[in-house]
Amino acid sequence: MQNRNTFSWVKEPINRSISVLIIIYVITQTSISNAYPIFAQQGYENPREATGRIVCANCHLANKPVDIEVPQAVLPDTVFEAVVRIPYDSQLKQVLANGKKGGLNVGAVLILPEGFELAPPDRISPEMKEKIGNLSFQSYRPNKKNILVIGPVPGQKYREILFPILSPDPAAKKDAHFLKYPIYVGGNRGRGQIYPDGSKSNNTVYNATAAGTITKILRKEKGGYEISIADASDGRQVVDNIPPGPELLVSEGESIKLDQPLTSNPNVGGFGQGDAEIVLQDPLRVQGLLFFLASVTLAQIFLVLKKKQFEKVQLSEMNF
């Protein structure tokens, strides 16, 4: 009986420690996985500015291509594919937050017309689900279902992202109309150069904050550098901190100018945006067009038959 009580006394703190570790793991993993889309979602009510610029370009400074493919026209209440392509060289490696090199992630924002939204799972065909893979999409805001974000996801696997989209039905939604609509897309590969608070990441070039002579370069224990500069104007010491990742371009005793690059630019990624157009087609118009084409075809057939009949009559009269 005494042994059993002793075991219970030992078991209780072990279980408590395991629970704490699990909670810490869940919290850290959640914050890491949600960090990238939240940057834009928390800072901007709308990802597309009045100028047409998508706000992701504020953090991803390099300009890179992106492509979108959608059908020319869709019928109401129909699920269709919007394919976003984010090309880049798969051999490239980016600087990670710890200064080491790793693969590039990709992400995208898709700005659809009002009324268009992510297709519900029960409306997506098995073939489309297979193309989508394990991707998980989310709305930019709970009240903005027409704006979708995805990422970061591994670029090696998802350089082509398929969005399953449900078109609106004007018969059910009064604000939907049979018109031609624009679709906007933004896509990035790799990490950004600036954080939303304006601070630099380690995936960008670092410049001198003063002109003068480099008196000391201290290599930090956890990586990165501390560069001391004797200001040429007043002789005071200015210290520039370089995080791990960028490669140093200067040396001790070197004279430098204000804003001169102290490091290389390690960024190999970038952001791009594009647009496309889609027509929400009225089924009655399609039926009317088909009826018109059928009528024209039948009229041409009857005209040919009538002509042949007339030629036969003329031929018989000539023979008579």
From Swiss-Prot:
Binding site for heme: Y36, C56, C59, H60
Membrane-spanning segments: 286-306
Gene Ontology CC terms: chloroplast thylakoid membrane
Family: Belongs to the cytochrome f family.
HAMAP family assigned to the protein according to its UniProt record, in alphabetical order: Cytb6_f_cytF
Primary location group: plastid
Organism this protein belongs to: Piper cenocladum
Keyword Chloroplast set for record: yes
GO annotation, biological process: photosynthesis
UniProt cofactor(s): heme
Annotated signal peptide: 1-35
Molecular function GO labels: electron transfer activity; heme binding; iron ion binding
Compartment(s) where it occurs, according to its Swiss-Prot or TrEMBL record: Plastid, Chloroplast thylakoid membrane
InterPro entries tied to this protein: Cyt-f_TM, Cyt_f, Cyt_f_lg_dom, Cyt_f_lg_dom_sf, Rudment_hybrid_motif
Function statement: Component of the cytochrome b6-f complex, which mediates electron transfer between photosystem II (PSII) and photosystem I (PSI), cyclic electron flow around PSI, and state transitions.
Subunit note: The 4 large subunits of the cytochrome b6-f complex are cytochrome b6, subunit IV (17 kDa polypeptide, petD), cytochrome f and the Rieske protein, while the 4 small subunits are PetG, PetL, PetM and PetN. The complex functions as a dimer.
SUPFAM superfamilies reported in the protein's UniProt record: Cytochrome f subunit of the cytochrome b6f complex, transmembrane anchor, Cytochrome f, large domain, Rudiment single hybrid motif
Membrane topology: Single-pass membrane protein
Protein name: Cytochrome f
Record's keyword terms, sorted: Chloroplast, Electron transport, Heme, Iron, Membrane, Metal-binding, Photosynthesis, Plastid, Signal, Thylakoid, Transmembrane, Transmembrane helix, Transport
Cofactor remark from the record: Binds 1 heme group covalently.
Keyword Transport applies: yes
